[in-house]
Amino acid sequence: KMESLLEEFGLNHIRKNRGDLLSGGERRRTEIARALATDPKFVLLDEPFAGVDPVAVEDIQRIIAHLKNKNIGILITDHNVQETLAITDKTYLMFEGGVLKAGIPEELAADTMVRKVYLGQNFELRKTKLEF
């Protein structure tokens, strides 16, 4: 299983490296591969886009789309709104301990209260949703 995950996530070249020497993107791919080692039906990704460069963000988005295509459920908690909304089917915006709004990204971006308390009035959703 480990061999196939290393191959699938392009991690063969770092298989002997110490964790503290990995880039942010390599670290994220390693974390996701490790989570998949038990063949889960559902994965929680906490801040997957934090601390990684734009190329790594796109790589992680591709991985998430790949997991979705394998029928693995994904729950993402992240403050990087553009990156997250670009790949989600349904979004729940939490505010003060509860769900402020749930819906597709376009619904959240258009909601007056969501803009007031979280997104800001100048927020613009990407024109097209990322497809991988």
Which stretches of residues belong to each language-model region?
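Hydrophobic anchor residue at the start of the ABC signature
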Residues: 32
